[in-house]
Amino acid sequence: MSKYKNVFIDLDDTLYDFKGASMESFKETYDLLEYNRYFNSFEQYIELYTPRNLQLWEQYGRGEITKSELNRIRYSYPLEAVGVQDEQLAARFCKEALSRIPTKNKLIPGCKELLEYLYPKYNLYILSNGFQELQEHKMQTTGIRDYFKALILSDHIGINKPRRELFEYALNSTGSTASNSIMVGDMFETDIAGAANAGIDQIFFNIKGSENLPFAPTYRVTSLKDIIGIL
């Protein structure tokens, strides 16, 4: 019998195919706003956007920039990189893209099967750094909201993964303990290292095939169905 009673799960790119939904939404918005006036291709836009976006999310996670600054800078940057100074256009891209993403019914393969297996056996909670207005919508769109007792969102609480305080909040607010809980996520730095720092066991969903990890997680899987063999 498993020692765990509570399973905290990251949403984006762990259960929800955020990358796929984002690319589809970005392409629609790119075409709608005729960004081909400024970029050689959609791929050029994404190549400019992606690394800067990752940097900004790291800053946001450390509390160095606000949510509004994150959105303003990351959507302005690709335009500025090709010599276009137009914050209004960048803001429209942001609004259009973010409104489209949660309407995409995209789940990581094996998601529904995993949740069907876990639901009768454990208390399930989402623990996410994603924006509050998007996460609930994504879960309703994909039909997975009812599997979860609660959504614990850093955007609502004001503390981001990997900070220990967020994991402690998650435990305290759900009546869980570190010893009877486990965290599932695809981001080593935020999900896995953060949980470990709070004394919580972890399942690293290594969907990207990362190697040379800073430390060995409690468990490591490359597909969601593998989690069934652990829990």
Model-inferred region functions:
Residues 52, 120-121:
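Structured helix-beta-strand junction loops
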Residues 121-122, 199:
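Glycine-centered short loops/turns at secondary-structure junctions
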Residues 2-108:
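N-terminal helical cap/lid subdomain that shapes the substrate entry/recognition surface
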Residues 1-7, 20, 112, 116, ...:
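Asp-based, Mg2+/Mn2+-dependent phosphohydrolase catalytic module
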